């Protein structure tokens, strides 16, 4: 793998935050990266080989002055296998959600999973030609009613089967923890203005309370 990128370009308005007072707070939520973007960030880290060497990030609150946390985050990631990753996420898109896209670029393949919530395979090209790109794109072309899509259903089914058959689940809690670690590292880098090396320890969103005041 050479590099991968995760782009989350969504809209969250005042009404969205008014519906739950914990949203956008440092104590109970975080901002765009922690809430809206973390699933694609999780995918990026998992697909790129998981282990990270270092990250540098920038965050800001450009529009949502009624929340505590960021509404824009950008990060550059260096993985231990030599590959790179880019994260770009925002809730400032007008007037509605635009896209959630994952790009993967390797020596012998290119993948683009797009749509509003990584629900459509838009590019699938590999040198081994084991799969027909058109067939893959036709098979993975969901049209969910909202950005939540159907992605959780197979994960729940796998966990149930894992419990019933006494096997390890396909994705465990440690994978979720690693996605959380990456977002916290981006926050840390943005706050200090420096590169953050992995692993990180003793970091919490509460540390960033008041950052954009």
What is the role of each PLM region?
Residues 38, 64, 88-96:
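Glycine-rich phosphate/pyrophosphate-binding beta-alpha loops
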Residues 182-192:
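Short arginine-rich
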Residues 66-69, 151:
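Short loop/turn motifs at secondary-structure junctions and domain boundaries
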Residues 1-67, 193:
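Predominantly a Rossmann-like dinucleotide-binding segment in NAD(P)-dependent oxidoreductases
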Residues 74, 79, 101-174, 196, ...:
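C-terminal glycine/acidic-rich active-site capping loop/insertion
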Residues 7-12, 61-63, 81-83, 91-93, ...:
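Glycine-rich beta-alpha junction loops
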Residues 40-41, 156-157, 183:
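A general structural signal for well-ordered alpha-helical segments in protein cores
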Residues 1-6, 86-89, 113-115:
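Beta-strand scaffold of nucleotide-dependent catalytic cores
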């Amino acid at each position: 793998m050479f590099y991968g990128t995760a782009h989350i370009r969504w809209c969250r308005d005042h009404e969205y935050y008014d519906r739950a007072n914990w949203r956008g707070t440092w104590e109970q939520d975080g901002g765009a990266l922690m809430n809206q973007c973390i699933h694609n960030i999780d995918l990026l880290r998992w697909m790129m080989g998981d282990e990270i060497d270092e990250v540098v990030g920038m965050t800001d609150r450009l529009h949502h002055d009624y929340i505590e946390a960021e509404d824009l985050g950008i990060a550059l990631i260096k993985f231990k296998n030599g590959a790179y990753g880019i994260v770009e996420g925002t809730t400032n898109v007008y007037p509605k959600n635009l896209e959630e896209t994952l790009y993967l670029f390797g020596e012998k393949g290119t993948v683009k999973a797009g749509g509003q919530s990584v629900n459509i395979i838009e590019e699938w090209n590999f040198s081994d030609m084991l799969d027909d790109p058109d067939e893959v794109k036709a098979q993975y072309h969901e049209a969910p009613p909202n950005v939540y899509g159907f992605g959780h259903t197979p994960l729940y089914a796998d966990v149930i089967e894992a419990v019933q058959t006494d096997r390890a689940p396909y994705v465990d809690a440690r994978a979720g923890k690693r996605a959380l670690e990456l977002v916290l590292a981006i926050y840390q880098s943005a706050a200090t203005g420096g590169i953050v090396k992995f692993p990180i320890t003793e970091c919490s969103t509460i540390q960033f309370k008041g950052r954009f005041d």
